[in-house]
């Protein structure tokens, strides 16, 4: 009897093995902030372990899907205004809006996509 497991299936099974996947906790601060048009705004995101530069920032408005702003920590998604910028690597990252505009009032999220250590 052939006991070999297809590589694709093995990969899926590994996701369910306790301890096989690293739990990376993300902490964003501040949780809320007050700002006015023209303000410089900085949001910080910290990872519980190094994720290199595998971090994305999203903007979400009520009733809308999240919009990708920044990927790989500092790369600006096409069409996103240059007042948005991202920086950082390892465990600490920042999203900066250089001059807040009325259209920028929204919820912002960071997301890591380094699933394995």
From Swiss-Prot:
Start and end residues of each Ig-like domain: 24-117
One GO term (biological process): adaptive immune response
Region (Framework-1): 23-45
Protein name per Swiss-Prot or TrEMBL: Immunoglobulin kappa variable 1-5
Region (Framework-2): 57-71
Record note on quaternary structure: Immunoglobulins are composed of two identical heavy chains and two identical light chains; disulfide-linked.
Residue span of region Complementarity-determining-2: 72-78
Function of the protein: V region of the variable domain of immunoglobulin light chains that participates in the antigen recognition. Immunoglobulins, also known as antibodies, are membrane-bound or secreted glycoproteins produced by B lymphocytes. In the recognition phase of humoral immunity, the membrane-bound immunoglobulins serve as receptors which, upon binding of a specific antigen, trigger the clonal expansion and differentiation of B lymphocytes into immunoglobulins-secreting plasma cells.
Organism, scientific name: Homo sapiens
Gene Ontology CC entries for this record: blood microparticle; extracellular exosome; extracellular region; immunoglobulin complex; plasma membrane
Family annotation (SUPFAM superfamilies): Immunoglobulin
């Amino acid at each position: 009897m052939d006991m070999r497991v297809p590589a694709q299936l093995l990969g899926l099974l590994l996701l369910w093995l306790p301890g096989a996947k690293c739990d990376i906790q993300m902490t964003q601060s501040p949780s809320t902030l007050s700002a006015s048009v023209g303000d410089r705004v900085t949001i910080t995101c910290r990872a519980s372990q190094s994720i290199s530069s595998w971090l994305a920032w999203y903007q979400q408005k009520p009733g809308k899907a999240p919009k990708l702003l920044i990927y790989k920590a500092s790369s600006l998604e096409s069409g996103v205004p240059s007042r948005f910028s991202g920086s950082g690597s390892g465990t600490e990252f920042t999203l900066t809006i250089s001059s807040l505009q009325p259209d920028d009032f929204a919820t912002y999220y960071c997301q890591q996509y380094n699933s394995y250590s």
